[in-house]
Amino acid sequence: XNPPQDWLPMNGLYYKIFDELKAWKDAEMFCRKYKPGWHLASF
């Protein structure tokens, strides 16, 4: 499957870097609302 536009595929998952500053809790909620089942990644 092709990744969504502007998303990076890695090990069967997709990642996107956002440049808007958010608190961790708010960023996690943003990810969950963006698509159910998705979560904020940490590196």
From Swiss-Prot:
Expressed by the venom gland. GO terms for molecular function: carbohydrate binding; hydrolase activity; toxin activity. Residues 10-43 form the C-type lectin domain. Its EC number is 3.4.24.-. Keywords: Calcium, Hemagglutinin, Hemorrhagic toxin, Hemostasis impairing toxin, Hydrolase, Lectin, Secreted, Toxin. It comes from the Eukaryota. Its main location: secreted. InterPro entries: C-type_lectin-like/link_sf, CTDL_fold. Belongs to the true venom lectin family. Monomer. This is Jararafibrase-3. It comes from Bothrops jararaca (Jararaca). The lineage of its organism: Eukaryota, Metazoa, Chordata, Craniata, Vertebrata.
